[in-house]
């Protein structure tokens, strides 16, 4: 059985971007391949949870939308957890830094790149549904090829 580093699972309305105001269950994963100083997640403090426990907790909220966030959620086995949640009719969204390709099972991809802060890091995700910029002075022209 797969286990995942979970910082928290909670129900709230999405407060940012396209889905603002829409109820979601947030699954915040631990671990990240970047270390942004402004990050609001203590991604090094988490509890290992198995897939069945995560799904059970999500289903208890009776909400048909989940957003994977972190840390960097693309570091996890999203195919397994995504398949299990999809079997329950749940729409899957992700907020990612874009450095790891996202599996096709994800319905909505928000790319929030930080690669300009990390010269040795490049964007691997080539498609998305929205681009989220979180720091001033970011040169957005480098994302012109991102298919959004």
Placement of each model-derived feature along the sequence:
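A generic structural micro-feature
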Residues: 19-21, 125
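Short, solvent-exposed loop/turn segments at secondary-structure junctions
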Residues: 32-33, 116
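Conserved Radical SAM active-site core
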Residues: 4-8, 23-24, 29, 35-106
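Conserved AdoMet/S-adenosylmethionine-binding subsite of the radical SAM
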Residues: 74-148
